[in-house]
Amino acid sequence: MIETGLTYKQVRRLYQDLERDGYTLERKSRTFRGGATLIHSHTSKIQASLLMQLYFNIGGEAVLRSVNIKALNKAFRMYHAIRKEVPGMKGARWAPFDITDAWCLASELRSGDAMLEVCDNCKCTYFTSVNQRTCVECPFCKEQGRHGGGEKECA
């Protein structure tokens, strides 16, 4: 499997174009996204942290061993309810995760490719993936930096 960073709509359009050109394609499996395409900025890291902390709080330590569908679904619904209530979490900069994205993050957490860490500075828990495309450690400290607090720069 190759992670391209393309949206589902773009991939479907490519498939349609190839089929229109006479190629026959057999999809072996559904695409599976991960930290490399989902966590690419401090805003996406804030959202992943919120979603996965809710998931962990609901499912407990068992979510580190297997994906708990009921806990993930409940966390996902709570995540979207919180997004609706927080001013400023709208627009392209704050693109929401879908349920497939939530499953992918939960799978990374289960496999050990991702973890919840506690920031030494602000004591907030945040989600981090070994595959993420951002050097942001604690996204909450970075967000505080935008409002006058200290911000840790990437090395």
Per-region residue spans from a language model:
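Long, charge-rich, low-complexity intrinsically disordered regions
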Residues: I2-A155
